[in-house]
Amino acid sequence: MTPPENRPSLPEVHRSIRVPNSNSFWRKMLAYAGPGYLVSVGYIDPGNWATDIAGGSKFGYTLLTVILLSNLMAILLQSLCVRLGVATGRDLAQACRDYFSPKVSFCLWVLCEIAIAACDLAELLGSAIALQLLFVIPLIWGVCITALDVLVLLFLQHKGFRYTEALVIMLVATVGICFTAEILFSRPDMGGILLGYLPKKEILQNPEMLYIAIGILGATVMPHNLYLHSSIVQTRDWQPTTEKRWEAIKFGTIDSTFALSLALFINSAILIVSAATFHFSGNQNVAEIQDAYKLLSPLLGVSAASAIFGIALLASGQSSTLTATLAGQIVMEGFLQFRLPSWLRRLITRLLAIIPALITIILFGENSTSSLIVLSQVILSLQLPFAVIPLVMFTSNRRLMGEFVNPLWLKSLAWLVAIVIVGLNAWLLLQSLWGWLLQVPS
């Protein structure tokens, strides 16, 4: 690993938030709280909605176990991001550039940009669908309107990183409150929910169930979040001593674990509401977010249910677009040492998402959008190994991490998660290839 010579990750906000010299746990927790919520946004974005709604309406509570396992994997991987960022002062993209050859780093950068484009596509479509449902705006116009969120991001960056964190926390809280109400409206079967969290082998045996399960994995554990988190933990201005680094790792891990637990509740709630409202009323093919919106109020008998659903979807889409931009900036600067103005970076990211979205809407109609969102989540899942494996490698490398290296139990768990992710992706590819071969005329 070459000694780090380049400037810090996200230099405009690097060490911009003061950590108090206080023995108060809560004062320090408040200072460190924030990055975890920016990361949690990626776990409740519209991509999760599409996969959770499809999974709940078709298979009831069965796929709750996938949401739980995916979230536990996410908590583990995000804790490694905190460890890497605090211990080395490098984000994951910078560490990859230092460790791998230029060709390998370039390939990893391309794969990561594809993942960010897929993620942004889901967020863009989710926000556009929400605008259409709430204000009867044509989907094509909604897609174009969401590109204007670049102005919000530029304003927040000018005000300071804490303002970005505050807005995102407010939007995440909005989604959480909305789905608490939806669960109360849907009156789900608590026994069925508890059984849904138990693993079932039929998930691996049913190709359609496996496809949605891996879509949930891709929607939950997102590759760009690993790059994002390893960078934004460095916004806190802790003293560069061993003791303070351990403290930063501890509080950063608590922050992300709590935030991702909230994301687990929201993801579970989306699937539970879908299962309770659609699956058990005979509507087992509700795959479109628009259909879910239209059916919620009639089936639940609560006129506000659909509007609350739409508000939560808009909050989810808008919050996740903010973090995708930051991730794109971190990835480009880290891998290529190439910096673009944030407005230009946002515009490029948006165009990469707008073009396939508009083409799909024009060619296949507005009802194809949720299928495109689910596909984007499967693409994200296929990119995961290329971010997870380097992360586990680096945090298990004693020469790089020093005394902050993963202990044996954490290293073993991390490699197990990496193997599970690679194995599930390989299984999906084999299933898809086999299905394609069966359809080819002999």
From Swiss-Prot:
Pfam families: Nramp (PF01566). NCBIfam families: nramp, Nramp_1, PRK00701.1. Belongs to the NRAMP family. This is Divalent metal cation transporter MntH. H(+)-stimulated, divalent metal cation uptake system. The keyword Ribosomal protein does not apply. One of its GO terms (cellular component) is plasma membrane. The chain crosses the membrane at residues 29-49, 62-82, 106-126, 135-155, 166-186, 209-229, 258-278, 295-315, 347-367, 372-392, 413-433. InterPro entries: NRAMP_fam (IPR001046). It comes from the Bacteria. It is found in: Cell inner membrane. The gene is mntH. GO terms for biological process: iron ion transmembrane transport.
